[in-house]
């Protein structure tokens, strides 16, 4: 097993941990609703079992960042533009900042600067990721062995962007958790498949 396969495994474990986190949220917290509550409410200030869920989020964020650091060289032997991987690295840095320093305010609300920074960083991270998806499509569309993934990357960017818009519309509604789940799943699935591709091609 080489270094690229190791970082790819980190990338595959990350979305599994993140998804397991919010699934366990519904199991371990009777007050938590997948229909009403967003994922970030699990690690809001004062939330029940916050430290338990923090472990999942922090570990997931760090593992994903480690994968991003090796992404450029893990794709097509490092041939092509740095733009996509750099966008992913920037997104990963913001994700770590959110995990360590910027939880939502008590009750999963956005009231003071910390909660507002959570929203700003999460949205910015998501948009950087979507831009990274598009950049990888440009980089890999004509590369043998990667063209199918390139098309998947473009489709993921479009779908993720639309789901972000829908989630934003319902952000204050009673169904924000239900609407958010497809969005986060689209991102997590992309992370897993990208990591799997790096693992299989190295």
Predicted regions and their residues:
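Hydrophobic, aromatic-enriched alpha-helical segments typical of multi-pass transmembrane helices
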Residues: 2-31, 38, 42, 46-201
């Amino acid at each position: 097993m080489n270094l690229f396969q190791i970082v790819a495994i980190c990338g595959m474990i990350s979305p599994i941990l993140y998804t397991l986190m919010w699934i366990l949220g519904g199991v371990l917290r009777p007050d938590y609703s997948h229909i009403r509550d967003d994922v970030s409410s699990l690690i809001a200030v004062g939330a029940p079992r916050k430290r338990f869920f923090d472990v999942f989020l922090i570990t997931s964020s760090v593992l994903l960042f480690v994968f991003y650091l090796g992404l450029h060289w893990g794709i097509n032997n490092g041939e092509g533009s740095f733009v996509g991987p750099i966008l992913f690295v920037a997104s990963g840095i913001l994700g770590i900042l959110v995990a360590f320093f910027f939880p939502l305010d008590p009750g999963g609300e956005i009231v003071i600067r910390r909660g507002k920074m959570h929203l700003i960083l999460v949205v910015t991270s998501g948009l950087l990721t979507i831009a990274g998806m598009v950049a990888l499509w440009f980089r890999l569309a004509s590369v043998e062995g990667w063209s199918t993934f390139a098309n998947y990357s473009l489709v993921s960017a479009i779908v993720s962007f639309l789901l972000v818009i829908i989630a934003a519309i319902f952000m204050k509604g009673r169904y924000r958790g239900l609407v958010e789940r497809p969005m986060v799943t689209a991102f997590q699935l992309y992370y897993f498949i990208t990591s799997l591709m790096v693992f299989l091609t190295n």
